[in-house]
Amino acid sequence: MLTQMTRLNISFTQDAWQEYLAWKKDDRKMEKRIDKIISDTIRHPFTGIGKPEPLQHNLSGFWSRKLNSEHRMVYGVTSKEIQIVQLKYHYDK
């Protein structure tokens, strides 16, 4: 179980990193929103902004947070790391 004092590292899958770079290039407002949500996720992986929710079915074990009405951040959490797997669209591409 994660405690409040745990400091988690962030990693991106290759696809998620490309999506982040695309947001950085095309939509600075969304980039700032993503950065804010990532920072909050580091502090509180399962609560906080973006309405965190555990995913089900083929994405069981992952969590999502709303970036806006169309896009979600999908991520997994271990005892040492938050891995971001998706930053565009709604769960499945």
Which residues does each predicted region cover?
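Enriched for short, Lys/Arg-rich terminal
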Residues: 1-9, 15-32, 49, 56, ...
